[in-house]
Amino acid sequence: MTDYKATLNLPQTSFAMKANLAQREPGMLKQWQQSKLYEQIREARKGREQFILHDGPPYANGDIHIGHAVNKILKDIIIKAKTLSGFDAPYVPGWDCHGLPIEHNVEKKVGKAGVKIDHVAFRQKCRDYARKQVEGQKKDFIRLGVLGEWDTPYLTMDFKTEADTVRALGKIVENGHLHKGFKPVYWSVVGASALAEAEVEYQDKTSFAIDVCFGVADVEDFAARVGSVAGTGNISVVIWTTTPWTLPANQAVSVNGELDYVVVQHGEQRLVLAEALVESVAKRLGVEELATVATFKGAAIEGLKLNHPFYAKQVPVLLGDHVTTDAGTGCVHTAPDHGADDFVVSNKYGIETLNYVDENGIYRDNVEIFAGDHVYKVDEKVIGLLEENGRLLHQAKLVHSFPHCWRTKTPLIFRATPQWFVSMTKNNLLKDVKQAVEGVNWVPDWGRARIDSMLDSSPDWCISRQRTWGVPITLFVHKETQELHPNTAALVEDVAKRIEEKGMDAWFELDAVELLGDEADQYQKVTDTLDVWFDSGVTHYSVVNARENLRYPADLYLEGSDQHRGWFQSSLKTSMAINGSAPYKQVLTHGFTVDADGKKMSKSIGNTVSPQKVMNDLGADVLRLWVAATDFSGDMSVSDEILKRTADSYRRIRNTARFFLSNLTGFNPQTDLLPAEEMLSLDRWAVDRAAALQADILKSYDTYQLHQIYQKLHNFCVVEMGGFYLDIIKDRQYTTKETSHARRSAQSALYHIVEAFVRWIAPICSFTADEIWQAMPGEKTGTVFTAEWYNLPRLAEGAELGNSYWQFIAKVKTAVNKTIEAKRSAGEVGGSLAAEVTLYCSESVAQKLTLLKDELRFVLICSSVTVVAASETEGEATEVEGLRVAVAKSSHEKCARCWHHREDVGQNTAHPEICGRCVENIDGEGESREFA
């Protein structure tokens, strides 16, 4: 038997079937770095319209987790897609380098600043620690295939950035938005520092929930205010609190003037409660009912004096709108030191704070009974004292959502302290910020409502911290008047120049005399540092506006949805305070990573996915494909199983690319590419499908619907290409003459498609795209990352054998395949090429099918196809209206070369084992194809 293998155009390519991404990618990264790929891209886009995505800085502490990977991959995909669209889209990665966690980690090694190590040396240790963390994270981000200015990222601890952060503060002062206030702020007793709203997270905490009686000091005064009071026993106003430790600082009880209140009889005593809460209080006390003995409006008891439950003093009743009937008793324990609402209502009545608790959460020496006690450990002592005094009505344990420090994970307290604030009301800053929200494009669009509602309850922003490792608040305050120095703007600039040279130590080590001269004795140098959210929040000023290759405002900010209360807000507030405009045109948010069951990821549960492990096992491109395949507008499920499925999808994409490349053997686009009008009908259709898909893909990239790109790509590879077109052209590719028009037509189509395909996947599967690019035929200049979208030829509108025609043919092919498969399963035929197919067609179906003439058999991949008039009894019914299919085993010999069963096999004596078509393709001029 003759071996005809050498006469076939068998596929060949250097593009490997097995990806081996984990092994291959590091070498490609090295090559990218050696060839200065990022710089090549910048050079290629020089002078083009810019697209600026500003990187929200991750915190420089610990290894990157899957959430970091998602964020960086999304940014990289968008930037690469924008570059393909012709934009100059630089990417400057950044890191947030100051703050408490770094201090804590350094303290563990060298002790507290000012105790075992001086402040200058401590700050240097913090700087060294942060730099080491940055290097570790940077290595992983680069390994993900993220391109950017990794040699010159921005760090909030860079001297220049620190200096510009100080300048940003100076602008805010200059524009009249800064003030010093004595207000209750979230306070970490572990970190001994104030926290901004953005640094607070809510976790469940078990607290004592107690009902406490504040006895009415003058019963006659009470009766005169509310009218007659029936019943017997002492009258007490009852408060409910989950923070017993704040009772030593109690200075009042607040009620709502508009609410209805009652006096109820409870055993030997009478209690004052909001009428709407009587039932829930009775349930709490374990009684069936509490009989009402008087009713009145809250306004009636404004100013009424009550006895403090354990101190020999009286406190007044105040009126406050913050009092509701959501829970408790409708009477609210009021300690202006320890609650925002308490502070506001007390301020209205001229009641000042007591400052009973120090920065470490310890009661000061002047606090009766509790001096020296820690607020975390005093609840039981307070409850015992209340019991002793007969003032404890009820106690229970309550699990509730409670503010915690997002860094140390410890419960916070509210504590009134002197702090620096960016005022949200002064100069209408909040109003301007809310107005700016309307001019920003939020994706998804619910982001607008989310940030808007958060801004509604936005207090003045406390930007001061009592830390060692942070950008200093470089202000001088008059010792007597507490006013800022009149020349603050110039002084801030002077200090900024010094910080630019020597870092923030230039301020901490500064002798005020150097700047203030003789005035130095009258002024105090502020020793507080800035909230880290201020550092990152002003990067629109210190980075975007400061770097020559960037431009303000940025086109896009892209972070997790938690940043509506974090970086998006701090950036917007500072930008409005400095420039009077938003720092971004568009804000895109992604959801959180969760496990396959939708549960939050946690090391303790053991359901985390390590990006490092994924890259080492499956490769970065699989991780990148998972990110693109997932709808990131909601929570993003990830697990080993999900990633395994993604790896399968990746293989389909890779195999499709491999088919394209392996069938372009011997094809030189410079000499062999056919004009579109000379290509076969099926090939023109395939290119047109690619062009239509490209239009969809580009739209999806522009609207950030990456999961749609994945779905469309997958469908293109599996259905339109793998399930139809590529199957059909194999015969033509392998069996026709190497340089025949029929083969060059298919190769021209494959070339067009792979040129487009490699660009479609480049932003997502970057390593694979580069690998494809290097295996493509023809001379290449630059890389796939410096290229622009490929211009695909389109079919003429209304072409006879256009898209609708080939879609119909695809349905017919599916119907025929089903019938053949049924016969094969029954053992009646071996495969499609061993089958002779008869199509019983209605007139309209027959008309369409006969357009392809004898080439219909190549499309249906059968040895012979006969189209006959419709029959209601012959053949099997199909899903195609007007079509029945009959399949019979071919009686003809199988061609040893093309495997078709043809009647002319053996008729040529020189080639007794092959068909006439193959003889023509070997020895003659070659067969001619018109359609497929």
From Swiss-Prot:
Pfam families noted in UniProt: Anticodon_1, tRNA-synt_1, zf-FPG_IleRS
Localization of this protein: Cytoplasm
Residue ranges annotated as motif 'HIGH' region: 58-68
PROSITE patterns per UniProt: AA_TRNA_LIGASE_I
'KMSKS' region, short sequence motif: residues: 600-604
Reported function: Catalyzes the attachment of isoleucine to tRNA(Ile). As IleRS can inadvertently accommodate and process structurally similar amino acids such as valine, to avoid such errors it has two additional distinct tRNA(Ile)-dependent editing activities. One activity is designated as 'pretransfer' editing and involves the hydrolysis of activated Val-AMP. The other activity is designated 'posttransfer' editing and involves deacylation of mischarged Val-tRNA(Ile).
Name of the protein in its database record: Isoleucine--tRNA ligase
Species of the source: Saccharophagus degradans (strain 2-40 / ATCC 43961 / DSM 17024)
Phylogenetic placement of the source organism: Bacteria, Pseudomonadati, Pseudomonadota, Gammaproteobacteria, Cellvibrionales
Gene transcribed to yield this protein: ileS
